[in-house]
Each structure stands twice: as structure tokens, then as C-alpha cells.
Amino acid sequence: MDFTLNEEQKMLVDTIRTMGQREKFKELARHIDETGEFPYDLLKKYADLGLLGMTISAEHGGGGQPALNAILCIEELAKFSPMIAAPVFESNVGPVRVIDIFGTVEQKKTIVPGVCRGELSVSVCMTE
């Protein structure tokens, strides 16, 4: 099995790295840690780049891409901070992916497209 990234995947990782430097994600991560406030305008930037819902079926507003592409983005964003990567995780391999596969028709119509457009965010709540 060949684990070499193709040119498109290399460009994707490079784009994420460049965006993180340009948008000063390290400083942003520090701000998030200090204040506990997430900058939800970041969702729109992610949506504009097609990072939200990359793996979600095109039928529900996603990109229909392989999971590896999303994982590469999540990995690169997490180098800045797990919180910076969280929306991309949640919209590709986390709760939105679960809704895309197992959700009701209504959930797929109302939740998934909004997340892919950066208009909604989702999370998971757990307890012991």
C-alpha cells in the first residue's frame, strides 16, 4: 500500500499551513485558551475553503471527498491547537458525519447543510 500523498493532498496541507500562519492561529489559540471564547467567524472562513463537510455526501451539501483529505486538514490545524481543528473534525468525522450516515431525513436537510456552510456548529456532550 502506498501512503504517499498525491499533489492535491500536498497542496491541501500547504494551504492549511499557510492559512494558519496568515490568520495567526497560534495567537488565536492562545486567546481561546485564555478567554474560553471561540471565534465563530472562523467557521465562515473554513466553509469558504470547503473544509466543513468535506467528507459529507454532496447530496447533503458536503464535498464528498475521501476521509483522508479531512484528516490531513484536521492534523495540520491541530498543530496550531485542537480547538482550531475542532470544527473541521466535527463536520467531517464527528457528529455531522454520524448525522449524514444515520440521521433522519429532516436532520440531514436542516443540520448538515447549515454546518457545511458555516452557519451552524455542532458538538458532543458526554457524562460519566
Functional labels for PLM-detected ranges:
Residues 18-21, 117:
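Residue-level marker of structural boundaries
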Residues 1-8:
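Intrinsic disorder at enzyme termini
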Residues 8-19:
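A non-catalytic, amphipathic alpha-helix used as a structural packing/dimerization or gating element
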Residues 25-128:
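Glycine-rich flavin
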Residues 1, 23-25:
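Generic N-terminal amphipathic, Lys/Arg-enriched alpha-helix
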